[in-house]
């Protein structure tokens, strides 16, 4: 039987890799005509361990192979990453195009000349940052599909920006932060200040507009979300409107739990044993992603809030981007002693396992989309504290559009030139967390309901399973 091979080109960052690999596994499990998923792994300078992550995540899946690309000799200057991360990433991918082109051409040539007993390349699945590779797809006569690791809301912004650029050909400025925008994928008007911080930078804004423009050239767009969690935006994209077909295939999650060499086995067991001893829904989990670093004064305010509330907690503190600092070092003197027995402070926490535990009752999160979907899957309500990328938009959508989260902040920014200098006070944090942990808060009931809906979406006959099967039918056509 003639079988298909699909080539994936992800952005080699943790959040993008996790959902990309899980989606590849789902395709292999859904249709036996797909026999191979080939992942082309670029060597991103600020994510040097991507290959190791890929290897561990795919070790048990023989249908996935990794092709590691060599380092490029002239990467973009690292200082560009601090001022315009979107531009850095697009420039990095552009510099990888010659190697990507040669690798894809070789894979297609090899499959075409191998006869009927081997798999044949059926198409490209590209991270949304990799839209420039659509040109390579055309060159080798393959359809290109975009995989949105984020949600419909962010796709709606990418659809909106090129139209805005035609009317107002410049980036947003600080004075437009309070401006409320009509973005067709949203029910409510969207404050400019919750858009990705890059829209306020000339280079980043241009990069986001370029991505939005090129999305039109894709054969289709796969979105890591599900119709029932973003119904208005999903309906908007289902209407076509001279746009590629959009497939809601989420939630695409790695729920096996993830280990980290920084957390010894004994520490993990101790943490889970402590959770086992706590009452149901009584523990607050605070975790801000792999890049979520707060200044010391803000850590002090969070600590004071936890003492004001008096609730049980697990708090993952990163003191630097490497995550190798002492999490207790920036804490107020005596905090660890005063909260002994009712709180755990660590540098890394097994997020999936904690959210899955019945003792966990609330999640203070940076609102990365993977984290949001994990919290919905396990029915744990979120208090929003966005940090970077599109997290401010995710926070706005969860609080204002969907009523699925409690607001600490919607527009907090922790990177680039728009970093938030204001310190969020202990009182403000405590007020939001008390609301979050209130068993009568209607947000909690809605989130628990979405947990059931999310599981149905990816179950047999669920909306996302049907959408994924439709995608498979479209990309394979009548050739397999």
Swiss-Prot record:
Binding site for UDP-alpha-D-glucose: 290, 349-351, 366-374, 388-391
Record's GO cellular component terms: cytosol
Entry's Gene Ontology BP terms: abscisic acid homeostasis; abscisic acid metabolic process; drought recovery; positive regulation of seed germination
GO molecular function (one): abscisic acid glucosyltransferase activity
Keyword Transferase belongs to the record: yes
rRNA-binding found in the keyword field: no
The EC number(s) this enzyme carries: 2.4.1.-
Gene3D superfamilies registered for this protein in UniProt: Glycogen Phosphorylase B (3.40.50.2000)
Domain of life, source organism: Eukaryota
Record keywords: Glycosyltransferase, Transferase
PANTHER family (UniProt xref): GLYCOSYLTRANSFERASE
Family as reported in the entry's similarity comment: Belongs to the UDP-glycosyltransferase family.
Protein name as annotated: UDP-glycosyltransferase 71C5
Organism this protein belongs to: Arabidopsis thaliana (Mouse-ear cress)
Organism placement in taxonomy: Eukaryota, Viridiplantae, Streptophyta, Embryophyta, Tracheophyta
């Amino acid at each position: 039987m003639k079988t298909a091979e699909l080539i994936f080109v992800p952005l080699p960052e943790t959040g993008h890799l996790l959902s990309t690999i899980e989606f590849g596994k789902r395709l292999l499990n859904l249709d036996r005509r797909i026999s191979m998923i080939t992942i082309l792994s670029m060597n991103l300078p600020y994510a040097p361990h991507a290959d190791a992550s890929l290897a561990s995540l795919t070790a048990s899946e023989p249908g996935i192979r990794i092709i590691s690309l060599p380092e490029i000799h002239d990467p973009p200057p690292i200082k560009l990453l601090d001022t315009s991360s979107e531009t850095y990433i697009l420039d990095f991918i552009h510099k990888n195009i010659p190697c990507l082109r040669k690798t894809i051409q070789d894979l297609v040539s090899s499959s075409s000349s191998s006869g009927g007993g081997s798999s044949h390349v059926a198409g490209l699945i590209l991270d949304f940052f990799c839209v420039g590779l659509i040109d390579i797809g055309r060159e080798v006569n393959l359809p290109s599909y975009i995989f949105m690791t984020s949600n419909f809301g962010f796709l709606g912004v990418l659809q909106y920006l090129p139209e805005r650029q035609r009317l107002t050909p410049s980036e947003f400025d600080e004075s437009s932060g309070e401006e409320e925008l009509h973005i067709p994928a949203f029910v409510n008007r969207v404050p400019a200040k919750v858009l990705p911080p890059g829209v306020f930078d000339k280079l980043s804004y241009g990069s986001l507009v370029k991505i939005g423009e090129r999305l039109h050239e894709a054969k289709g767009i796969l979105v890591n979300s599900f119709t029932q969690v973003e119904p208005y935006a999903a309906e908007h994209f289902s209407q076509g409107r001279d746009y590629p077909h959009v497939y809601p295939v989420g939630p695409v999650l790695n729920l096996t739990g993830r280990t980290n060499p920084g957390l010894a086995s004994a520490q993990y067991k101790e943490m889970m044993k402590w959770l086992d001893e706590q009452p149901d829904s009584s523990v607050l989990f605070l975790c801000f992603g792999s890049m979520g670093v707060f200044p010391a004064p803000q850590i002090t305010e969070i600590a004071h809030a936890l003492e004001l509330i008096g609730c049980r907690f697990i708090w993952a503190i990163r003191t630097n981007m490497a995550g190798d600092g002492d999490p207790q070092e920036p804490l107020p003197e005596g905090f660890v002693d005063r909260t002994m027995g009712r709180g755990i402070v660590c540098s890394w926490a097994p997020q999936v396992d904690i959210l899955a535990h019945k003792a966990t009752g609330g999640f203070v999160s940076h609102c990365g989309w993977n984290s949001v979907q994990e919290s919905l899957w396990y029915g744990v309500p979120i208090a929003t504290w966005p940090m970077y990328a599109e997290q401010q938009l995710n926070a706005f959508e969860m609080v204002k559009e969907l009523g699925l989260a409690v607001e600490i902040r919607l527009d907090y920014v922790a990177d680039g030139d728009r970093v938030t200098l204001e310190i969020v006070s202990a009182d403000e944090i405590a007020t939001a967390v008390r609301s979050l942990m209130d068993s009568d808060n209607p947000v909690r009931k809605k989130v628990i309901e979405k947990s059931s809906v999310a599981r149905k979406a990816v179950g047999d006959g669920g909306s996302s399973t049907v959408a994924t099967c439709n995608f498979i039918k479209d990309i394979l056509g009548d050739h397999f």
